[in-house]
Curated annotation (Swiss-Prot):
One of its GO terms (molecular function) is nucleic acid binding. Pfam families: UPF0102 (PF02021). It comes from the Bacteria. This is UPF0102 protein Swit_0572. HAMAP family: UPF0102. Coiled coil: none annotated. PANTHER family: UPF0102 PROTEIN YRAN. Belongs to the UPF0102 family.
Amino acid sequence: MNRRAAAERQGRTGERIAAWWLRLHGWRIVGSRVKTRRGEVDLIARRGRTLAFVEVKTRGDAAGLATAIDEYRLRRVAAAAEALLPRYGVGVENVRIDVMLVRPWRRPVHLTNVWHGQ
């Protein structure tokens, strides 16, 4: 398997783990790998009247996770979330962008409300 295919497989596995983790914590997954012209959102989750657009990053080590999220990536998720809000945001009071950091054999880390725009 080439490196790109291996990275794609690792990313999909991380998204499944993140979705599982969110479900265990009371979230309902209402969308996954949703693409727009502005970008892609890995997971869209809802709990009560809160809607979270979730970026999932999967890396093999802590050092890789530490550099996986930057302003550019969050800005693209925010742009995609803005485009998707009319479709997924009916009846919600709170909208936020979260990040899930996934490493093998470790609990996922859920960072909430990481983007406040600029």
